[in-house]
Amino acid sequence: MPQRSALTRSVHYGWYVVAAGTLCVFAGLGFGRFALGMLLPAMGASLELTYSQMGLISTSNFVGYLLAVLVCGYLSSRIGSRLLIFLALLLVAVSMLMVSQAQSFMTVAFFYTLTGMGSGASNVPMMALVASWFSTGQRGKAAGFIVIGSGFAILLSGKLIPYLNQLREFDGWRISWLVLGIIVLIISVICFMVIRDSPGELGLKPFAGMGSSRKDGHFPFDDGQKSVTRKDIYHLGAIYFLFGCTYVIYATFIVTTLVQERGFSEMVAGNFWSWVGFLSLFSGPVFGTLSDKLGRKTGLIIVFSIQMCAYLLVALSLPGMFLYLSIGFYGIVAWSIPSIMAALVGDYVGPQKTARVFGFITFIFALGQIAGPAVAGFLAEKSGSFSSSFYMAAMFAGLAVVLSFLLKKPAQVS
């Protein structure tokens, strides 16, 4: 017991929860969703998929995600976030193993829907735990470190999947799904061993920063604003919807665009995607911390402006050097919005209501994720190019800038 007390004084246990959260996002979202972009070209060729079917496979994942976030708040309150996260990651692992054996579009879509359910049921409670383990002035940074798990997954998948795919000429992608599923299975056990539902279980208080004189953090609205209205929550949901609709178009179709429209090999396109993963490692911590310092609204405006530029640079079919710039813009802010939104919800409603409210706006976010790839695939099929899809993403990102500008600070919400 004395040894544990000494350890928690030097490193607050909340940071161990953050580390487990990084692994959770790495497995549930990083492999469960973002690896798809690297796998689609090979799967499309092997299973003879159309652009629309590729888009619908991605959409099936988001349908599952949508269904999961509807019940996350209820399940979390009944069985606890720790057990829910473990079971959700277990579902991700098993469904990915089943995708590796799929022989048709419908089979892939069915099991990838289950993957989406596991992704949603692990991600929402994990992000909501930030409000329980950290006070307001630390939430952006803590959430930022959790969301970079997706970046690590993209970085690894961009290198690993092309290697695994070439092990078998026509269906190496099956090996990729198998390996990824096994990794997720291992991570589910690690998360169950490390995560705790609240600092109170260990006799601790939420982390407020080194040397903080306030036990509840250094903002007066750490317990949430009772004056927050339903309109304010819908406002947050609208912003999160636009993020869901736009970022997923890029994540799903950029590799396919590079391979099928720009003539890049799968290996070179994988290197591009790995750069997204590497750069995204900085996105959550940098912009999450920036939102702690400059305000959530300023952080959102900066991030959406950069994303709009990333989408336009692909849509305009400019020379190759601009693709590098687009990759750079997308990567450096890739996971910033979820970290800022998780912190912002905690600022608005406090730790006790964060899981429920974050689950609600994540439901709206998931609607955007369903609409985005489906519409993008349809536009690409009709126009013969993904340029129209990226133009749409840029327009929606611009709208998100405007909505972010109109956000009220938590203390000003009435």
Regions found by a protein language model. Give the residues of each.
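Extracytoplasmic gate region of multi-pass secondary transporters
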Residues: 36-40, 229-284
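C-terminal ends and interior cores of transmembrane alpha-helices
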Residues: 90-103, 306-318
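Paired small-residue
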Residues: 95, 106-114, 321-329
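Cytoplasmic helix-loop-helix junction between adjacent transmembrane helices
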Residues: 111-148
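Helix-loop-helix hairpin linking two adjacent transmembrane segments in secondary transporters
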Residues: 145-200
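C-terminal transmembrane helical hairpin of 12-TM major facilitator-type secondary transporters
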Residues: 274-284, 289-344
